[in-house]
């Protein structure tokens, strides 16, 4: 698992059918770090600190072993100082 922060929503209306309509968010480990795109499985907002999983765990967390994701948000952290 990784601790990451949600930077903003990513709008992508034209997708492959397997992705469905799950929200996509831009996340990073800290401001200035490389950005990544994560599937939002729980309903996050920009500024939230979240727990993310990758690889096959990301696909299963998104709802299916065949889901095309390599990063999925699985939890919102209630308190985190960002260090």
UniProtKB/Swiss-Prot annotation:
Its main location: other. Pfam families: EutN_CcmL (PF03319). CDD domains: EutN_CcmL. It comes from the Bacteria. It is found in: Carboxysome. InterPro entries: CsoS4A, EutN_CcmL, EutN_CcmL_sf. One of its GO terms (biological process) is carbon fixation. Expression of 10 genes for alpha-carboxysome (Cb) proteins (cbbL-cbbS-csoS2-csoS3-csoS4A-csoS4B-csoS1C-csoS1A-csoS1B-csoS1D) in E.coli generates compartments that resemble Cb, contain RuBisCO and have its catalytic activity, showing it is possible to make artificial, functional Cb using these 10 genes. Cargo proteins can be targeted to these organelles. Artificial Cb assembly in E.coli requires csoS2-csoS4A-csoS4B-csoS1C-csoS1A-csoS1B-csoS1D (but not the gene for carbonic anhydrase, csoS3). One of its GO terms (cellular component) is carboxysome. Disruption phenotype: A double csoS4a-csoS4B disruption does not grow in ambient air, has a wild-type growth rate in 5% CO(2), called a high-CO(2) requiring phenotype, hcr. It does not grow to the same cell density as wild-type. 1/3 fewer carboxysomes are seen per cell, about 13% of which are elongated. The carboxysome shell is more permeable than usual to inorganic carbon. Required for growth in ambient air. Keywords: Bacterial microcompartment, Carbon dioxide fixation, Carboxysome. Homopentamer. Probably forms vertices in the carboxysome, a polyhedral inclusion where RuBisCO (ribulose bisphosphate carboxylase, cbbL-cbbS) is sequestered. Has been modeled to induce curvature upon insertion into an otherwise flat hexagonal layer of major carboxysome subunits. A minor shell protein, only 12 pentamers of CsoS4A/CsoS4B are calculated to be present in each carboxysome. The 2 CsoS4 proteins contribute to the impermeability of the carboxysome to CO(2). Belongs to the CcmL/EutN family. CsoS4 subfamily. The tight homopentamer forms a pore with an opening of about 3.5 Angstroms in diameter which is positively charged. A short loop (residues 30-33) protrudes above the center of the concave face to different degrees. This is Carboxysome shell vertex protein CsoS4A. The gene is csoS4A.
């Amino acid at each position: 698992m990784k601790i990451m922060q949600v930077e903003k929503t990513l709008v992508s209306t034209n997708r492959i059918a397997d992705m469905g309509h799950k929200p996509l968010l831009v996340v990073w480990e800290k401001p200035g770090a490389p950005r990544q795109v994560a599937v939002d499985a729980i309903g996050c907002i920009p500024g939230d600190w979240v727990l993310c999983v990758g690889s096959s765990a990301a696909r299963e967390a998104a709802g299916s072993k065949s889901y095309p994701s390599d990063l999925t948000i699985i939890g919102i952290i209630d308190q985190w100082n960002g260090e």
